[in-house]
Amino acid sequence: MAPTAASIDEYISTFPEATQEILQELRRRVHAALPDAEERISYQIPTFAVDGQYVIYIAGWKHHVSIYPIPGGDGELDADLEPYLSGQGTIKLPLKQPVPWDLVDRAIAARVAERVPQIRR
């Protein structure tokens, strides 16, 4: 993982170009699902928040990128995510494989649908 960065741009810039492209696309897709997301670094990784409370995190690593947390409880989504799950609610996307963007979008949408109502009640 990259050292603590002051911004998401700075964080992403510490990775190789191919990883930067994936992280930027993840960032774009989070904003597409959550247009009013606030960006910050929390726990040394990019964090997207609403009303000051986290919704979703992304992170870059040497061999993969991660998205977390991902909710469970949707049988079809859970089954589709199973090959990418690592630990409780973490998706690991290996850098040597094509990113399953449709699945990523579904996972992000599920997290937004779960978390935002909790924040805004």
Give residue spans per PLM region.
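Charge-dense, helix-prone N-terminal extensions
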Residues: 1-121
